Amino acid sequence: MFKEFREFALKGNVLDMAVGIIIGAAFTTIVQSLVNDIIMPPVGVLMGGVDFTDYFIALTWSDVAPVSVDAAKEAGIPVIAYGRFINAVIQFAIVAFALFLVIRQMNRLKARIAKGEAPAPAAPPRQEVLLEEIRDALRAKG
């Protein structure tokens, strides 16, 4: 059983998938920073100094109006945190676009390789070549 597991774990596809997951996790951190620290602040300024992370709808009323999603959650108020959802949608769009660019380049590279590696047409069998020579000789006589 251990031998089978080792063979499975050391297959190229499993190792490639593991590397992809690790790189994906690191890429997620980069994208989150890009969205939260670089993209959203200018968008917030353009919209009048808005910080989307604190946009929410309180589902119950309380005596004290919470000023942030975290404050509302600490007070036990259920909220719909649509500002965080907006950030998540933007992050998803960035990741999807980045993956699109990578896959697009890979497909282009595969197409170039396929064009360069097109197999040469196979040579006709020797019998066929001899028959064509005989045919050509008979036509020349005739």
UniProtKB/Swiss-Prot annotation:
It is found in: Cell inner membrane. One of its GO terms (cellular component) is plasma membrane. It comes from the Bacteria. It is a multi-pass membrane protein. GO terms for molecular function: mechanosensitive monoatomic ion channel activity. The chain crosses the membrane at residues 14-34, 83-103. The keyword Membrane applies. Keywords: Cell inner membrane, Cell membrane, Ion channel, Ion transport, Membrane, Transmembrane, Transmembrane helix, Transport. InterPro entries: Mechanosensitive_channel_CS (IPR019823), MS_channel (IPR001185), MSC/AndL (IPR037673), MscL_channel (IPR036019). Homopentamer. NCBIfam families: mscL, PRK00567.1-4, PRK13952.1. HAMAP family: MscL. Belongs to the MscL family. Channel that opens in response to stretch forces in the membrane lipid bilayer. May participate in the regulation of osmotic pressure changes within the cell. This is Large-conductance mechanosensitive channel. It comes from Parvibaculum lavamentivorans (strain DS-1 / DSM 13023 / NCIMB 13966). The gene is mscL.
